[in-house]
Structure formats: structure tokens, C-alpha cells
Amino acid sequence: MAITQERKNEIIKEYRVHETDTGSPEVQIAVLTAEIAALNEHLREHKKDHHSRRGLLKMVGRRRHLLNYLRGKDIQRYRELIKSLGIRR
């Protein structure tokens, strides 16, 4: 259901802004996107798992907030990120 630490580290290496970056909006959005995809797969099998569905909605809301922040801060980085992650906005 959750993503592994190795997968999370791969995502961080791919989307980081500088060498020690783990908390930039790009990294946070990319990690949340992977977690959302994993949780979607879980919910396809377990349709009545409403507790996990609530967690999914919270993750989507957090990602939306970070995307809005990034769009206001740097529109070019925002456009590149949604294109590379395949997020429709």
C-alpha cells in the first residue's frame, strides 16, 4: 500500500533542486503523487476502506495546496513539474 523507502529516495533524487534537498515543493509533490497512486491501487481492491479513502483525500488536498504555492512562486517550475508527473490541472 505505501511506497517503500527506496522508491521514496529515488523520487527525491529525481526531483530535488540541490544536493541535500528533501523538502522543496517539487519533492513533496512528487512523493505525494507516488503515495496517492499507491493508495488508489489499494482502494480499487478494498472499496469499503473509508479510513484510507479519508487519508487519500487529505493527501490530495495537501498536494493541491503545494501546487498552488508553487504556481504562485514560480510558474515555469510548476508547469515542468505537472508535465513530468502527468498531473492534470
From Swiss-Prot:
Q: What is this protein called?
A: Small ribosomal subunit protein uS15
Q: Which family does it belong to?
A: Belongs to the universal ribosomal protein uS15 family.
Q: Which residues form a coiled coil?
A: none
Question: Sorted alphabetically, which keywords does the UniProt record give?
Answer: Ribonucleoprotein, Ribosomal protein, RNA-binding, rRNA-binding
Q: Which species expresses this protein natively?
A: Staphylococcus haemolyticus (strain JCSC1435)
Its Gene Ontology cellular component terms are: cytosolic small ribosomal subunit
Query: What subunit structure does UniProt give?
Result: Part of the 30S ribosomal subunit. Forms a bridge to the 50S subunit in the 70S ribosome, contacting the 23S rRNA.
Cystine connections: none
Function comment: One of the primary rRNA binding proteins, it binds directly to 16S rRNA where it helps nucleate assembly of the platform of the 30S subunit by binding and bridging several RNA helices of the 16S rRNA. Forms an intersubunit bridge (bridge B4) with the 23S rRNA of the 50S subunit in the ribosome.
- The gene it comes from is rpsO
A GO molecular function for this record?
structural constituent of ribosome
| UniProt superkingdom | Bacteria
Extract the Pfam families matched here. Answer: Ribosomal_S15
Tell me the InterPro entries matching this sequence. Ribosomal_uS15, Ribosomal_uS15_bac-type, uS15_NS1_RNA-bd_sf
Q: Which GO terms describe its biological process?
A: translation
